[in-house]
């Protein structure tokens, strides 16, 4: 009987990131598909699913292979999205690429969230198949709530008349945090709030300075849990995500599911998926953001949330669970075919 080990080694470090949320989504997807899973390596299982690139995940994959189990490795990270992140990340990017290549090749199959990230990984010369499959979104859980909106605005002292711009992510340059702060300076009539956190030792000096910016309309409250973040989506007038590089961006799926208008950067991962002026608004830099942001907030541009919600339904947890089941079946079908060929020799 099929059973999956969702290995959670490294989650103490990655649990507050998109990888942590991705693991939650995988568990829900397997549950919806009726596929048994466990987080306990001591239980019986025949597939291990790995999500981090810490040494313990590589070790777990190698151990599972030695025991004849199948290994599914999620390619959440690329060299490209490692750059412009933590202190020293640009200097270490080449080493990071070699390391993640070693990790990913320990799997029987590599799953990565988008066709864009699959194309990137395929340029690394990986010797294992790479499959594009969204991290997914639990549409039953992510529902816009008037009560949640009220809680959020009361908690952060936003009046009903003020427009609120929401940002979510680590305190890293890649997430576009510098542009977020700059827009807060340009538009004092709007409130800006960014949820997320990063250990201070890993934050580059210019990002640390940006987060300490003192403006009456700018807040950095730190990390919040899923429920409070859903309240924030419900109570915000715009999700501003000026990220410079993503493999998908789970927060993008969350905002679309919560029917919060989205303004993001026009980057390759969203080409052919998120259409400017149809599902989201996209800008190339501060000049575009400065023009689009007030037009969205003041209703001078059409509200796109209905079309965005229709699109994000393609990323539903139910569909992701069915797709995972197909990937698992393919792994064992290959094993049976190889066994049959050996018997014929």
Name the predicted role of every residue range.
Residues 91-110:
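Membrane-proximal helix-turn-helix segments that form the acceptor-binding/catalytic region
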Residues 104, 223-224, 231-236:
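Short alpha-helical donor nucleotide-sugar binding micro-motif in glycosyltransferases
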Residues 244:
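Aromatic "clamp/platform" in nucleotide-sugar-dependent glycosyltransferases that forms part
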Residues 261-264:
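Short hydrophobic beta-strand element within catalytic cores of glycosyltransferases
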């Amino acid at each position: 009987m099929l059973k999956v080990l969702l290995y959670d080694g490294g989650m103490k470090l990655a649990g507050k990131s998109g990888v942590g949320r991705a693991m939650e989504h995988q568990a829900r997807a397997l549950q919806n598909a009726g596929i048994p899973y466990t987080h306990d390596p001591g239980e019986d299982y025949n597939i291990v699913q790995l999500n981090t690139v810490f040494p313990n995940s590589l070790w777990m994959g190698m151990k599972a292979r030695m025991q004849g189990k199948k290994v599914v490795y999620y390619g959440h990270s690329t060299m490209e999205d490692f750059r412009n992140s933590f202190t020293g990340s640009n200097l270490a990017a080449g080493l990071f690429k070699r390391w993640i290549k070693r990790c990913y090749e320990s799997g029987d199959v590599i799953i990565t969230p988008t066709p864009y990230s699959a194309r990137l990984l395929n340029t690394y010369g990986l010797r294992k198949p790479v499959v594009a499959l969204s991290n997914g979104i639990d549409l039953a859980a992510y529902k816009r709530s008037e009560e949640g909106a009220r809680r959020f605005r009361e908690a952060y002292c936003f009046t009903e008349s003020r427009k609120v711009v929401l940002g979510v992510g680590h305190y890293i340059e890649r997430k576009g945090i510098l542009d977020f702060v700059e827009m807060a300076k340009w538009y004092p009539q709007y409130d800006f709030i960014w949820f997320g956190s990063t250990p201070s030792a890993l934050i580059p000096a210019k990002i640390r300075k940006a987060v300490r910016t003192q403006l009456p309309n700018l807040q950095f409250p730190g990390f919040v849990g899923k429920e409070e973040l859903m309240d924030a989506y419900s109570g915000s007038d715009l999700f501003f995500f000026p990220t410079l590089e993503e493999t998908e961006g789970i927060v993008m799926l969350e905002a679309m599911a919560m029917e919060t208008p989205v303004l993001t950067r026009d980057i390759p991962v969203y080409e052919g998926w998120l259409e400017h002026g149809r599902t989201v608004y996209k800008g190339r830099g501060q000049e575009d953001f400065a023009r689009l942001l007030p037009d969205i907030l003041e209703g001078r541009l059409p509200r796109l949330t209905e079309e965005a919600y229709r699109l994000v339904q393609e990323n539903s947890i139910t569909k992701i669970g069915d797709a995972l089941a197909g990937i698992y079946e393919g792994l064992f079908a290959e094993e049976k075919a190889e066994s049959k060929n050996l018997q014929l020799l």
